[in-house]
Amino acid sequence: MIFSNSFIYWYIKRKFRKLNVRPGMYSQYGQDKLVFELLGNKQCGNFVDIGANDGVTFSNSLFFEEKGWSGICVEPHSTIFKNLEKRRKCKVLNACISDTNKDVTFYEVEGASHMLSGIKEFMDERHFTRIHREISENGGAVTEVKIQAITPQSLLLNHNISKVDFLSVDTEGCELSILKFFNFNEIPVACISVENGSRSPAIFKHLTSNGFHLYCCIGCDEVYLRDY
């Protein structure tokens, strides 16, 4: 089924909900609480957290780790990754998710705006403008570095993951590109929380055409469930 952009904007707006973050949960808008409930308070599940930051601040996966889930956190920013390594017990990887297992050019932001870092190839002009505006206002610097890239298939194969209960994607503008690298027919994923601050209809179109439906919008994230 083909949806117009105007319909998608209307539909996404209807799906917006607000949750209070409860003690013991770490997500910025309560995504972890919501996903845990949607998956039936599942025990011994697994997660893949792409753009995991320092592993604690606004983490969508730390709650699940503390519940005994297994998983992997992926964070490309070299400085932030050092904090991730110290703070998390799960598997961690300093890399970018891409369509290649070769090195890619990474736009690494230092300072208060470090969470805006990302793969240069996938950033649009609005994101570049935001980075330089925030550096101008808050200080910091940005450098281009080469960093290891890995495909989702290689990532999961290397860590013996055959299916994913919860996929979190928060990569500051690269979310759609990363989702397109996943072959959801080969890699079953039950639930996805993906940042979409601009409410671009492209993510909705891609995921609904790959067997998911939008459950709700919460903060800047959209939460999708697999159709079974």
Where are these regions (language model features)?
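Phosphate/nucleotide-binding beta-alpha loop and adjacent structural elements of enzyme active sites
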Residues: M1-Y228
